């Protein structure tokens, strides 16, 4: 009953009421402390997301409070960083994003971090991507971020090397699509471009925000299917159509190209 009441508040967007109810449940030992803190972080993030446009400073405070309760909550970090970027405070945005990245590298953090300043050159963005790689080396998200930024900067050898390294860690649709983009930009060889596109079709899909069998482009605090709080996870969608990447190993795929 307590859970149903909490979820009802959430479905109606009554975040403050939900937080008060959660605090009461925690005080009465209805809910375990660790779970209560995680759920409160989710509620604070939901509240922050709704007021980012109208009250960016208030949204930032809620998001930072959420991060104290759940230090790897990517959506909270994104909201806090966006609030700082509205004030052109790149340094403070970085201080929010970098610890979360080190703990849980996420492509949405990489995208915001690398493209934080609209006036940056492609080389500036590449340097920022390389900063992320230095914080989390030998990681698929770090390598992908550098590969993408290197392609934009027309540093094709670096782009190709980083994309291949990412593919060796975990072959994914997006990596093979990036390989196709690199091929198109560097050589224009349509045969090779088609080869990488074919690999992308066979590769596992990239992780996404998934809950109760649905995929969302963005994180949501509550499942639209069941009303469950904190339902969304960042993972590969279920039921994906995939086949083995041609030649079974990425080494063979790279060699064949």
Language-model-derived ranges and their functions:
Residues 172-257:
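C-terminal non-catalytic interaction modules
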Residues 21-23, 63, 80, 97, ...:
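Inward-facing hydrophobic residues that define packing positions of alpha-helical scaffold repeats
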Residues 39-52, 95-168:
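Alpha-helical adaptor scaffolds
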Residues 10, 51-52, 68, 84-85, ...:
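Hydrophobic/aromatic side-chain positions at a characteristic register within alpha-helices
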Residues 28-37, 132:
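Flexible helix-coil transition and linker loops at the boundaries of alpha-helical arrays
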Residues 7-28, 88-108, 167-173, 184-208:
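TPR/TPR-like (Sel1-like) alpha-helical repeat modules
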Residues 1, 35-36, 76, 109-110, ...:
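TPR alpha-solenoid repeat register
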Residues 17, 58, 75, 91-92, ...:
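Alpha-helical positions within canonical tetratricopeptide repeat
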């Amino acid at each position: 009953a307590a859970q149903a009441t909490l979820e009802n508040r959430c479905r109606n967007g009554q975040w403050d009421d939900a937080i008060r109810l959660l605090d009461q449940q925690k005080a009465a030992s209805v809910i375990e402390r660790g779970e209560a803190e995680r759920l409160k972080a989710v509620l604070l993030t939901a509240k922050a997301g709704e007021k980012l446009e109208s009250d960016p400073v208030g949204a930032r405070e809620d998001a930072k409070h959420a991060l104290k309760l759940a230090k790897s909550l990517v959506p909270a970090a994104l909201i806090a960083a966006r609030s700082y970027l509205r004030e052109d405070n790149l340094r403070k945005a970085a201080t929010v994003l970098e610890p979360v990245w080190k703990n849980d590298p996420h492509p949405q953090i990489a995208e915001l971090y690398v493209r934080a300043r609209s006036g940056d050159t492609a080389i500036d963005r590449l340097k920022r991507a390389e900063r992320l790689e230095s914080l989390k080396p030998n990681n698929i998200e770090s390598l992908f971020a550098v590969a993408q930024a290197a392609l934009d900067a027309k540093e094709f050898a670096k782009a190709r090397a980083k994309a291949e390294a990412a593919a060796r860690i975990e072959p994914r649709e997006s990596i093979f699509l990036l390989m196709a983009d690199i091929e198109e930009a560097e050589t224009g060889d349509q045969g090779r471009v088609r080869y990488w596109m074919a690999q992308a079709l066979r590769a596992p899909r990239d992780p996404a925000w998934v809950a109760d069998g649905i995929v969302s482009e963005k994180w949501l605090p509550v499942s639209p299917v069941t009303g469950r709080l904190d339902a969304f996870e960042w993972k590969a969608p279920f039921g994906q159509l995939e086949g083995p990447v041609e030649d079974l190993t990425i080494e063979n795929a790279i060699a064949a190209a």
